[in-house]
Amino acid sequence: MGARGKTLVPLLVVVATAAMALQSTYLQVDPEKPELQEPDLLSGPCGHRTIPSRIVGGDDAELGRWPWQGSLRVWGNHLCGATLLNRRWVLTAAHCFQKDNDPFDWTVQFGELTSRPSLWNLQAYSNRYQIEDIFLSPKYSEQYPNDIALLKLSSPVTYNNFIQPICLLNSTYKFENRTDCWVTGWGAIGEDESLPSPNTLQEVQVAIINNSMCNHMYKKPDFRTNIWGDMVCAGTPEGGKDACFGDSGGPLACDQDTVWYQVGVVSWGIGCGRPNRPGVYTNISHHYNWIQSTMIRNGLLRPDPVPLLLFLTLAWASSLLRPA
């Protein structure tokens, strides 16, 4: 073998190895497994947590129990909750941006149990991500319906035991009338009671209330409003378990066969934990197509570079083997 051939063999080995490594970064989606999202929505497994097992009437959460929970921060201060959908996309409530919709002002903190990590917590800084772009639902007009927003991050999130994405479904009928779903957040623990230091993430178990019942509850005396089709209610008729101020944008999540799905986004309520005033959430399934199309239009999908890389390498190699 000539000098060209001697150079070519190790080069091809290096290129093939690099191509295999690159291909491994593109997670393959198995349609037979329910815990894997469609490839054009999420790039791999979702809804799994490492810890088995505001919020009014809640308890302190454990680190890693809700690994998709994010703290949406404006100028470094917690304002709303958020959830991680994949390495570049985050879901929250549109009304969080009523006063400031400049992406430069916003970051999302993942992997922390407190909304106020220590200044010396270098790990927290490494898990804080700048917002690149904000996408509000085109139907949102500073009113409660369509209260949903997608955030594109400026850099990809690094997954670990405490940072993982949650799953979405285009239909949440299977969660209707469930009594064992959860709301999480760093909001107030009562209408007149802020979350005390050390500002630990709170969790509370709530029941899904069908819209017909929720409308009936909200039409009782002293306040009347309508529960729209893109809303879902959760709580208890007697009150005491609810999201509160500062929980907006966070997840209402339910599990199915140990896989966790986000059913709703914390949107609004009358007070916090009042009887016959359950929390109202944006129904994820109602906006599933918008979430999907927004991600696709704005750069979620990337062409697989492996075939192109191998083709160009082989073409170049064949040119080297031609007689001089």
UniProtKB/Swiss-Prot annotation:
Active site annotation, chain numbering: 95 (charge relay system), 147 (charge relay system), 248 (charge relay system)
Top EC group: hydrolase
Span of domain Peptidase S1: 55-296
Bilayer topology annotation: Lipid-anchor; GPI-anchor
Prodomain residues: 22-54, 299-324
Cell membrane in keyword set: yes
Known function: Could regulate proteolytic events associated with testicular germ cell maturation.
Protein name, entry field: Testisin
Species this protein is from: Mus musculus
Name of encoding gene: Prss21
